[in-house]
């Protein structure tokens, strides 16, 4: 990097290594966590549960000790309301705020006489490892999609807290609740917990029970669970590690400074894989990262800018040789995956989902023939075509991995995937593996595909293109006021009077997902060769337009332009 480049603002240096001026002051962040107190009259400082829990930063007084104490107390009361009496598993990622937030949560849980299990190795815990552990500990109990016992007796059931803001920047914190089904909590649960947490904040935390930090160590209700051993030991039940080992597939795994760092080394050792942990460094500033598209440090393993160093490392040399057959990335809690191949570079998440589905449904012979293919409605229609070729039902659901939980839990849905590089699938015998997204699993699947087929996932995608066509896909943002976003969220098909989109007859106008009839919180319009979906942003005054065309980039541009005009007209 030249001296002139170093002088540029961060937003003008995407894909380049972070500089000292780009890094957070960890001490100041932790001090803000301890001393900041939210203004409950400010919506930006209240507890808000999105699809991935509550997120914020201590610097903006949206993720502080008060928030975590209130949320944890609310979770305790939610459990009591439903008679859930088993231990709470608590895991954390490598973000600076995750450690102190775990301390807060444990103190409140113990203050309420709740049994707590933390990582027995004192390490970091990926989201999928917590999900897998919950399912393991609740094995033998028949659970409903909401996470409760079918027989109505929730006594002894285990649930969990995962402290992570996922791929968010280093100054952020995040806090998720996973009910006894192991997956993301549904809207009923998150609304209840958020409302109660905000009541507790408004009351100055009156009603929050908590032990002193000095009383945590040695507390009778505090125990340990070996998340890593359980997860790594069980991998042969879901991935053909023997095929990967025997084929000698060379894997380069980049934890991106996240919770998967110890897992990858143990996976290599335990299963005898030719696997190199590309960057084993853990730094709460994430100072080893390259900057994302907007100049922020973001552990987004689907971003070419955030993955720039790994992509560069995988570039074949003059002799056409690359150091690995596949390189992989995971975000901070390892619920997302990034796949880099020598012949294709960083794969588009939609492309890899299509490849994974095509491979799995052809190579998991014990999976029930009646099980459909789960996708979110903003994922590529290449998946629709692959599902049709496989003779499988397409199960299209709204955005949010929680919608895949019922299928993964019962085996009626053996795979669920999102366009944002999150997916999971069941074990060889059809039993659940993880009801939350599992980035390690999807990375290992890429190695299995190479081992079994002799082709890279990129090659496999080119085969799918030859068979089904080559879609152009993109997402753009369009401005919208809060009132317009609210209107978009509650549209009905009758509000859309048009019959054509970009020269094609509209075949479907959807405001509910066809796979489960749940509201999509927006609009999807489908033609023979294209579609678009519009959804309001939860954090900005914009709405997102996802669009795809099998007629090429120019037609996609036309679809996007007409989609924006249509939506703007409808929401006024």
Could you describe each region identified by the protein language model?
Residues 57-58, 87-93, 130, 250-254, ...:
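Short glycine-rich or small-residue beta-strand-to-loop segments that form or flank ligand, phosphate
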Residues 2-45, 141, 153-155, 171-320:
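Gly/Ser/Thr-enriched, mixed-charge loops and adjacent short helices
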Residues 27, 81-85, 89-172, 266-338:
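N-terminal small/polar loop signature for handling phosphorylated ligands or for N-terminal nucleophile
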Residues 72-88, 240-247, 321:
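Glycine-rich phosphate/diphosphate-binding loops that line cofactor/substrate pockets in enzymes
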Residues 100-109, 171-178, 335-355, 383-386:
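Short Gly/Thr/Asp-enriched flexible loops that form oxyanion-binding sites at enzyme active sites
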Residues 322-326, 363-538, 542-572:
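Phosphate-binding and adjacent anionic-ligand microenvironments
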Residues 120-124, 195-228, 341-417, 422-425:
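Proline/glycine-rich low-complexity loops and linkers
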